[in-house]
Amino acid sequence: MLLHGNAVVGQSGGPTAAINATLSGVIKGALEAKEEGIIGTLYGMRNGIEGFLKENLIDLFDVFENAHDLSTLEATPAAALGSCRRKLKSHEEDAETYAKILEILKKYDIRYFFYIGGNDSMDTVLKLSRYAASHDYELRVVGVPKTIDNDLMATDHTPGFGSAAKFVATTVKEIIRDINVYTMDAVTIVEIMGRDAGWLTASSALASLNGAGPDLVYLPERVFDTDTFVSDVKERLKDHPAILVAVSEGIRFADGEYVGAGTQSGAVDVFGHKYLAGTGKVLESIVKNSIGCKVRSVELSLTQRCASHISSLTDINESVMVGKGAVKAATEGRTGVMMTIDRAEGDEYATTVGCADIAGIANAIKTVPAEYINEAGNGITEAGIEYLKPLIMGELELEYEMGLPKHFVI
């Protein structure tokens, strides 16, 4: 049954190089729905659900006047609408906030709610879809995935991951070229994002596709042991003097403690996640004290999620596709779902867009499977490389202005 009304879209959580491509897809899908007389106006919420509660809304049909603007948006990193990390409590705990949300939905005649985000954002989608249903307000709520962590269930991979993986693999490849100019023993440790899942760190192994890759790779999926690590490093140094170690920020000891915990303040975000960083520095100290060779650590930090200058064309195209698919799914009656990217079987890479019940996705984590990690727990298998490889293919043609990439700023 057709549902006529307005729509709203927001972005939440950590930005990526492709989250705006997904926003572009939602806008394109909404424009098509407008031509069909289904959607009247597409509002953009500034700073996610936080901005929505303040009625900080803009008419995106007015902001984006032509296809060129959308094309520029797709090549723009970070979240053009702004983001937030607000965690909605349950309706029972905070009835006032939910009543406010319903009031705003009715005020603007919003019948379609699209939320682009990662794991914690899907929790918001789940809560809103259930609340609307329990209060007899017809609202189609669709989660649109994005995360460089690639840790969302039900989808083969997430929009944003391919571009981040391409950046990580490229940066590791370039660092390897740099560290190999000297003959002295030296260890370079590259710390890569990934709290509970090591997908992004695993992608560093893609540097080996046309050259040398990292010598050692450590993921949160395997327990980290200091003695084994030192032994691994010593063995690699026997083969050549300069080695590179790729490590996830979230690796843990056998007792579950983060390796980098000693460098942390102990502070957590609104979702209860500890702030992580410093793992590379801890490993640097271990190498310095145990081996005594030259050692340095490099933290890729925010560059992993905002390097749109080296986006994966596959990732950008799929991100747009997922955004358009979200609108199509909603106008066809789906709600309480998250869009998925489904990979076709066979040697030739191909994907389609699907959707899955949000209840099985929110607050769950997809980790790197055992078959993608070598037996020693310090490298990526050929099966892992084959899974990752198609996701970084293709280059985005950028528009430059004054020698720098042009971005669309709302």
Where do the language-model regions lie?
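Short glycine/serine/threonine-rich phosphate/pyrophosphate-binding segments
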Residues: T16-V26, F52-L53, K89, E96-A99, ...
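C-terminal non-catalytic interaction/assembly regions of soluble proteins
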Residues: A261-I410
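N-terminal phosphate-binding or glycine-rich loops at protein starts, especially the Walker A/P-loop
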Residues: M1-I58
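Flexible, glycine/charged-enriched surface loops at secondary-structure junctions
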Residues: E36-M45, D178-A186, I243-V245, G292-L300, ...
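Short, ordered loop/turn segments at secondary-structure junctions
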Residues: S12-G14, M45-E50, R85-R86, G118-N119, ...
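Accessory alpha-helical/coil subdomains and C-terminal extensions
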Residues: I104, Y112-G117, D123-E138, V142, ...
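Glycine-rich oxoanion-binding loops at beta->alpha junctions
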Residues: M1, E55-R111, D120, P159-F161, ...
